[in-house]
């Protein structure tokens, strides 16, 4: 039976959440149980490898008013917004132990999330 350790952190700066993920990744890589980190971030836009500052569709006045942080990351993707009230889950899981690839795992997470939201009468869609 697989063990998954979960931690709810609360509101955390994106950089600190990233540091927590790196620590969790090292632990899981050493054979320790998989982890999921649940937290919220203050207003932040993350720019992934395919992102560009031009993809941020709010002006400097809004960025200043909302105290938006812009954080460049080496992760995939383009631009993502995170903010207060948005629960973010970071699964740190050794997929080899589950005999799954990343695409299959992400599809299962999407299905799980859609199912969970439907129990709260929240409609969600998966775009492939």
Residues of each region from the PLM?
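Generic structural signal for residues in well-ordered beta-strands
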Residues: 3-6, 70, 124
């Amino acid at each position: 039976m697989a063990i998954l350790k979960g931690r709810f952190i609360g509101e955390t700066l994106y950089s600190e959440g990233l540091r927590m993920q790196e620590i969790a990744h090292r632990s899981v890589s050493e054979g320790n149980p998989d982890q999921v980190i649940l937290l919220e971030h203050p207003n932040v836009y993350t720019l992934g490898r395919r992102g560009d500052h031009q993809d941020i569709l709010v002006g400097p006045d809004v960025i200043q008013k909302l105290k938006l942080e812009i954080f460049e990351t080496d992760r995939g993707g383009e631009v993502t917004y995170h903010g207060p009230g948005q629960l973010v889950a970071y699964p740190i899981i050794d997929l080899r132990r589950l005999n799954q690839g990343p695409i299959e795992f992400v599809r299962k997470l999407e299905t799980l999330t859609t199912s969970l939201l439907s129990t709260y009468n929240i409609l969600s869609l998966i775009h492939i």
